[in-house]
């Protein structure tokens, strides 16, 4: 019976229904508890407080941990499906690396800045938030999207690793260039990489290596169904948490959503189509083109939130 329920989650025709339901549940939770009235705790700070023995149970802290748990549930299954030897092959992909680096650092931040100027010039907080969102390439969700789209998973991981290194150097430069004299701890980028990429990668690799070694490939093939299910549940759970964080604000100021949805939708559609076609015309196959497209399009909301909290007011 439980497996039948899980199989419904694998039906991609039903996925939009589950996504909308998760968003609705999140908004209801946010409205019920008035969560946006609380100070938002950065997920990494909540993790640190646990290790330091200073964690206090509260709605913001619990939701902060929910983001970490949800992202781990999404990324870990994708990592577990990666073979060590495939990672080695993916490192020998100079064309893919060049396309992603070019679009991520020569196009994406400035394209997002242009969209912010066009649609949000009269809303300084929303303008700043959107520009911040455009600075950092994604280091988590793109692996999940590549995985769900049957793209080249090992290549996606290598591209994410490249982005992780480059953005630690360039984000402070781009932030000052596009937003003026702002100050934040660049280590928030490194911490995000370790938490959202490093931890699931290690756990996934150990699961595959130790599981196959002890139980065999057939066991792992059976496990894959449940790993895929975990990834989808993680996606839905993360949506609930993210919409709960600002559920009451969404209902009070729905135009915020409309104002941000237009430039963000334009950004994602235009960027993905242009990058995918560039990769395709460059001779890459579907799997590589998908991995390149998502890696050059996805943005890192975790890093954007961390910078916004440390360098700007809560509205941003």
Feature-to-residue mapping (PLM):
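Alpha-helical transmembrane segments of multi-pass small-molecule/ion transporters
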Residues: 1-316
